[in-house]
Design a protein with these regions (language model features):
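Internal alpha-helical scaffold of NAD(P)-dependent oxidoreductase catalytic cores
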Residues: 108-117, 133-171, 181-220, 265
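Glycine-rich Rossmann-fold phosphate-binding loop(s) that bind the pyrophosphate
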Residues: 10-11
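Aromatic pocket-lining residues of Rossmann-like dinucleotide-binding sites
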Residues: 21
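NAD(P)-dependent Rossmann-like dehydrogenase/reductase catalytic/cofactor-binding core
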Residues: 208-270
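N-terminal Rossmann-fold NAD(P) dinucleotide-binding loop
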Residues: 14-15
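Extreme N-terminal starter segment of soluble prokaryotic enzymes
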Residues: 1-6
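Rossmann-like NAD(P)(H) cofactor-binding subdomain of soluble oxidoreductases
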Residues: 33, 39-42, 48-136
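Small-residue helix-packing motif on alpha-helices
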Residues: 32, 42, 199-207, 228, ...
């Protein structure tokens, strides 16, 4: 049986999820039904998205077609949830609804879409380059086929982890807020190189290559971060001098607290 997918909100993350499936012919463009909020968005997608998917404005008559799709990928802004739920035709069909809305709990999804089987997903911005991390929490009565199809949506653009919902907030803090934290660290280290006389562009390149090389070394040699730190830290040397400054400035504690704070903030959005 052909499965039709409704994509409700067609931003960068939704495109990153759908595009690999189209590229690998795992789904056909005619089986994708996209719902957008404005004529501008509709025209932009028609002009710039290379696949000829079905696309409708939310206020058009044709938009009702999305509610008959077996799978809905919900990727609007969280504040649009009420508006979208009011468009639902409320047919009892037990179709699959996969939400990537930040901070919207399974309970709220089930409340807004009682005739669907709901799944809450957290993913992150590197999914747009095929390097995402995706956490999945299953709602009630999800069939095995629906679980497998949900994983199919994400496995071509990200690594998948399954959690009970209690852990999704921490997963979100680490993986979704994490890229901004890493970007800040890259900026700060690059500014350190700038202070030492390096050109900004070169300093940024060196920092990013250093981080990539460090991660590769840890993963390929299967060593711990402590092992690596000890490998490059000599008595009285430059590295221990740098680490001493960071410990005195409580960098470790600040990073831990940043994740705890982001996780707590995610819980407040539920």
């Amino acid at each position: 049986m052909t499965i039709k997918i409704a994509v409700i909100g067609f931003g960068n993350i939704a495109k990153a999820i759908i595009t690999p499936l189209l590229e690998k012919n795992l789904i056909s463009p005619e089986d994708i039904y996209c719902l957008v909020n404005s004529k501008e968005s509709l025209e932009n997608i028609k002009k710039n998205f290379k696949y000829n998917v079905n696309i409708f404005q939310a206020d058009s008559k044709e938009s009702n077609l999305i509610w008959d799709c077996q799978v809905k990928l919900l990727s609007v802004k969280p504040q649009q949830l009420k508006e979208i739920s009011e468009l639902d035709n409320h047919k009892k069909n037990e179709n699959l609804l996969v939400s990537i809305l930040a901070g919207v709990s399974l309970d709220k999804l089930i409340q807004k879409f009682p005739n669907h089987r709901c799944v809450r997903v957290v993913t992150n911005i590197p999914i747009t380059v095929g390097k995402g991390l995706t956490g999945i929490s299953w709602g009630e009565d999800i069939s095995e086929d629906q679980k497998q199809f949900t994983k199919k949506l994400f496995k071509n653009s990200s690594k998948i982890y399954e959690f009970t919902e209690d852990y999704l907030d921490t997963f979100l803090a680490l993986t979704s807020s994490g890229p901004a934290i890493i970007a800040l660290i890259i900026e700060a280290l690059s500014d350190g190189g700038l202070s030492g006389g390096l050109q900004k562009k070169l300093s940024e390149e060196l920092v990013m290559e250093m981080i990539l090389g460090t991660i590769t070394l840890i993963k390929q040699n299967n060593i711990s971060t402590t092992d690596l730190r000890n490998m490059v830290t000599s008595p009285g040397g430059t590295t221990i001098s740098a680490l001493r400054v960071l410990e005195n400035k409580n960098l470790r504690s600040a990073l831990i607290e940043s994740i705890v704070s982001a996780s707590n903030r995610s819980k407040e959005f539920r």
